[in-house]
Amino acid sequence: MALVDLVRAGGYSIEYPQFSSMAKLKEFPHSEDGKLVRLLSWHEGVGLGGGLFKVSTSSTATGNDGTVVVASNGVRLLRVVNGPIWADMFGALPNSDIDSMPAVAAAYAYAASVNTDLYIGVATYKFKGSTPINIDPSRAGIIGYQGKVRIDCSEFTGSIVFSINSSYSYTPAAYYNNLSPALQGLYVLGAKTSGVDGLLVGRETVGADKSYNGQTEIRECTFDKFDRNIRMGHNSWRFVFYKVNSLNALSPNGILYVPAGLDDSGEILSFYHCQFFDGAGSNIRLSCSSYTMVFNTCSFLNITFFVDSASSATVTCNGCNFENPGSASTRRYVDISAGHTNVFNIIGGSIVTNSNPGQTQALLYVSTNNLLNLVGVTVPYGGHYQQEQELGYHAFIGGAGTVTASGVMLQLRNGAGTCPLHSSLSTFSNWDFGYGNLNAWTVDKGAGTSSVVEYLANAGPKGTGGAMRVAPVSVGTNVSQVQAVTNPGMFSMSCMVNIATTSGNAGQISIGFLDAAGNSIPGGVSANLGTTTGWKVIGKNTLRGKVPIGAKQIRVNVQTVAGADVKYAYLLCNVVK
């Protein structure tokens, strides 16, 4: 009885009326000011959303059916709140026939008004209607309990389910306190409905004031099957995504979309342990200039990361995984295809290509005046690599931009072979006969003065680009070039060859090394041309190796036997370290 006496001494009664549902609580004509009543359940017989309410005959507060209830006679009942705010207090119910969105929206509005987070209990909830929930990270977030809350938005018809944007601006003084998650622990599922997006990060329209969104965090959430799962808006800067997944979107840009022209946006968007997956044609696209994104130990699965910003976008992937699990489609992983001064860094991590009928695209692509940096990665290779079908030559990376490589490993013991990285790393001058002649190449016809060694325009594998035709008459012909090289390092070379006629093996391409005095040293390799006619790749599993210790020069020699008629194009060799 001591506990009962203590409760009564505190001004509370333990003999108070009980109501089985919110509807019955509102129907009763409450009139005794200060009286405590108990709501057993918001919905009849469910056991969720109950609690103590205190009758207030003087209150004129607006009812929200959660913390302020207006009875049938107009009297207010005020919820006794002494802990976290839960969505079920406002009528949210894990039931596929009940639209819980109005309840969650009302619960969040109250939580934000008192600067505390809203919690949603473990279950699956249905969201219908068309009005988004706008989250103000400076005031309150929405947290799914234990990270196991599922929200079914398959019948939602609005343009956005959730948007995140602070009500605080830079002036007169920023709140500087977006330290609790704006969203956490939610699996938000759509139905691939056109025009319905899962999450807008930032503002939909440009405002005269600037929202202070720094340090806003989205944690342990999944957005699945929306038109665009995650879309960046105006004032999107210094947002943090931790263990966020974006899966199976409808739009070609639906996995993660950063549109052009965003106002006051792009200062360090950070992603940690996130997963981006599709496989049906939806991708990541960064189109906004001066936008910086950093991905740490994230996975990019069966998607392409497009960068078509007009200028100055920067993407850094630290320890990330690029892969095509379970896919039979040829796919590019990174495509920097427009603008200028865009930078994409791949630092550590893994690049994996599971076998498919034919990898006919270069895995990575960087257009002119843009930069792709590879640091501390192993370059994969497979027998299904057929990048020459797209590029006209055999290389891991396509495009006319610039590639740098530091601490990069070639798979020299891969039975399928290796390939050079990129044309900008070419060891040899005029590797593609792009000078419009054979300059930089030394021709040795020997005694066969009538042998043909000539430049041909628009004669490459795709009917464009230059080629070198060699047709020795009486003795074989050698075409060679020597360039400086440093060690340690690894080399890989590929060459496109088209044999028109030959009576046997048409010749050989060899790579050798010289010391500082010009003496040959061990470590060279060679590849026979064979007899097969038509354009083909030479060097996949033969023209590769380590630069030997002491090497100061690298020499390539193209030998064509007498009686053969061969075209050569794109003699691409890279030395990386």
From Swiss-Prot:
Its biological purpose: Functions as a receptor binding protein (RBP) and mediates the attachment to the host capsular exopolysaccharides. Displays a depolymerase activity that specifically degrades the K2-type polysaccharides of Klebsiella pneumoniae capsule.
Organism: Klebsiella phage vB_KpnP_KpV74
Any single biological process term in GO: adhesion receptor-mediated virion attachment to host cell
One cellular-component annotation, GO: virus tail
Protein name listed in UniProt: Depolymerase, capsule K2-specific
DNA damage is among the record's keywords: no
Subunit structure: Homotrimer.
Entry's localization field: Virion
Origin: domain of life: Viruses
Transmembrane domains' residue ranges: none
Keywords carried by this UniProt record: Degradation of host capsule during virus entry, Degradation of host cell envelope components during virus entry, Host-virus interaction, Viral attachment to host adhesion receptor, Viral attachment to host cell, Viral tail protein, Virion, Virus entry into host cell
Protein family membership: Belongs to the K2-specific depolymerase family.
